[in-house]
């Protein structure tokens, strides 16, 4: 498994480069990311965990090809954060130590969809599995949505460790709701074309995550948490389409690996029709 930079002058960055003959592209002779750099790939967040640091910012606007051996799997782009449009092909944010450290490479997503629908690329998943680096990560389910009053809801979610190793996950019961809502906007939903989302979410900012804010889930274990969220206006009742994003942690390079497992990184987006009562 490797990622090669496409030599300049062959492609324009439009964000929607499709139907490209990958075998016609001239690539750098040496891979930007080689197999020995990769510790694992988490399928639930489409994230490479590395044993080295990789610069991303200097490749802003450049294209890359993900390959397995001699097979070129798909085209992607280092997407500049200043672009007003969104890529329609797999993307990596072209920023160093921004959102993710340089020993984490995460493919971009728009809501529950990864750009280029990388989650539907079976040949990529098979190649990861054949390389022995594929990990299943987590599964997140939105369990319950309760209306406390016209401006506040309690939402309940369940996170299950589908992986083969212990995962460190942010725990709202340990870090507090206001800190949890610094890294996620919680829930929002729609009913009859009317959208409901909290305004001025009460959150507490932070720069580092102490060990005490994590829950450690062994393989097969789960956590169920109920979190309160205020700031809505005139909440409805009945069936709504609800969205929730479970967040990964904030870490620096070299911190993801633990003696007994790893810190889960990324975002797991849930979309579900659910009763608000």
Which stretches of residues belong to each language-model region?
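A structural signal for conserved, well-ordered secondary-structure elements
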Residues: 1-139, 183, 265, 269-277
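Exposed aromatic-hydrophobic patches
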Residues: 49-52, 224-229
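Short structured motifs
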Residues: 140-143, 208-213, 226-229
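Asparagine-centered strand-capping/turn motif at beta-strand->loop junctions
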Residues: 147-149, 157-167
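The feature marks short-to-medium sequence segments in extracytoplasmic or secretory-pathway proteins
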Residues: 169-222
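Terminal connector regions
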Residues: 226-277
């Amino acid at each position: 498994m490797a990622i090669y930079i496409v030599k300049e002058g062959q492609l324009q960055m439009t964000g929607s480069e499709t139907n490209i003959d990958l075998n016609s592209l001239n690539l750098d002779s040496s891979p930007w990311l080689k197999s020995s750099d990769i510790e694992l790939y988490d399928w639930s967040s489409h994230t490479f965990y590395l044993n080295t640091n990789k610069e991303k910012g200097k490749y802003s606007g450049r294209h890359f090809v993900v390959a397995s051996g001699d097979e070129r799997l798909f085209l992607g782009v280092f997407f500049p954060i200043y672009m007003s449009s969104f890529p329609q092909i797999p993307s990596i944010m072209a920023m160093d130590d921004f959102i993710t450290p340089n020993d984490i490479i995460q493919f971009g997503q728009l809501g529950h969809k990864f750009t280029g629908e990388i989650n539907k690329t079976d040949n990529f998943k098979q190649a990861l599995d054949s390389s022995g680096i594929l990990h299943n990560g987590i599964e997140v389910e939105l369990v319950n949505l309760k209306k406390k009053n016209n401006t506040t809801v309690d939402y309940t979610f369940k996170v299950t460790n589908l992986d083969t190793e212990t995962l460190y996950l942010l725990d709202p019961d340990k870090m507090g709701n206001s800190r949890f809502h610094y890294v996620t906007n919680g829930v929002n939903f729609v009913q009859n074309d009317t959208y409901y989302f909290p305004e001025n979410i009460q959150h507490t900012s932070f720069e580092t995550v102490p060990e005490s804010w994590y829950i450690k889930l062994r393989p097969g274990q789960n956590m169920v948490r109920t979190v309160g969220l205020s700031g809505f206006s005139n909440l409805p009742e009945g069936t709504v389409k609800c969205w929730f994003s479970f967040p990964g942690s904030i870490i620096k390079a070299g911190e993801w690996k633990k003696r007994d497992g790893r810190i889960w990184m990324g975002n797991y987006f849930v979309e579900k029709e659910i009763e608000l009562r």
